[in-house]
């Protein structure tokens, strides 16, 4: 059976990025625990492909068909992934505008039932509910399955843009284990013997 794919999506628009480090750590642990492949998409890399002022055809990139191939490939990777880890830095009390634009280009039916793990980074604990009040409703629109456990991290939880506190590392480990267990159950349902059991 083909291994499941985990795609990490980080809404950072600068590098180095604590958000990217967090998303990457979660996705890597999930992949290791579940035997999945994983890929990291950072907005700092694909943003120029999602926001070209004018593309080769002279059309603004408000529709995916007008995007360069690299931009379309990022969206298709999200749509075809078996599971997604989504993280954002907090800007003005919400997720980054670049992250919202990316998901505005995702097909409304592409994430139905897809497992999604949410995380965010911020400079103050006052934004601690951003995963619940901002990110979860966004993926509720897509009818995705968002993991009950989310991760919120502060700048002080990192050292040199890498996870620096044991408490955050423990939360990442717990969330990754829960997500991997969910993926393993999904993989089991896709095995031929599972299908025969319900025939």
Language model regions located:
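A general structural signal for alpha-helical elements within enzymatic catalytic domains
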Residues: 28-31, 107, 140, 184
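A short small-residue
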Residues: 3-8, 115, 152-160
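Mobile beta-alpha loop/short-helix "lid" or hinge segments that flank ligand
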Residues: 41-53, 141-159
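Helix-loop-strand module that forms the ligand-binding subsite of alpha/beta enzymes
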Residues: 66-142
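N-terminal beta1-alpha1-beta2 submodule of the flavodoxin-like/Rossmannoid cofactor-binding fold
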Residues: 1-88, 93-100, 170-173, 181, ...
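Short, histidine-centered active-site or binding-site loop motifs used for metal coordination
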Residues: 10-12, 120-122, 155
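Glycine-rich phosphate/pyrophosphate-binding loop and the adjoining helix
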Residues: 146-199
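Residues on a specific face of well-ordered alpha-helices
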Residues: 24, 28, 97, 133-137, ...
């Amino acid at each position: 059976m083909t291994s499941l794919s985990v795609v990490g999506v980080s809404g950072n628009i600068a590098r180095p990025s604590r958000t990217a480090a967090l998303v990457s750590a979660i996705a890597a642990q999930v992949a290791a625990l579940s035997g999945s492949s994983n890929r990291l998409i950072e907005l700092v890399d694909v943003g120029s492909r999602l926001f070209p002022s004018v593309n080769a055809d002279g059309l603004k990139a408000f529709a995916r068909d007008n995007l360069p191939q690299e931009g379309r490939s990022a969206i298709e990777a999200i749509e075809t992934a078996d599971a997604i880890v989504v993280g954002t830095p907090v800007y003005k009390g919400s997720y980054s505008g670049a992250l919202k634009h990316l998901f505005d280009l995702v097909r409304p039916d592409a994430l139905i039932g897809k497992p999604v793990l949410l995380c965010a980074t911020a400079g103050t604990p006052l934004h601690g509910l951003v995963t619940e009040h901002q990110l979860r409703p966004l993926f509720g629109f897509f009818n995705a399955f968002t993991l009950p456990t989310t991760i919120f991290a502060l700048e002080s939880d990192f050292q040199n843009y890498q996870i620096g506190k044991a408490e955050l590392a423990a939360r990442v480990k717990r969330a990754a284990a829960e997500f991997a267990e969910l993926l393993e159950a999904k993989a089991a349902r896709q095995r031929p013997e599972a299908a025969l059991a319900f025939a």
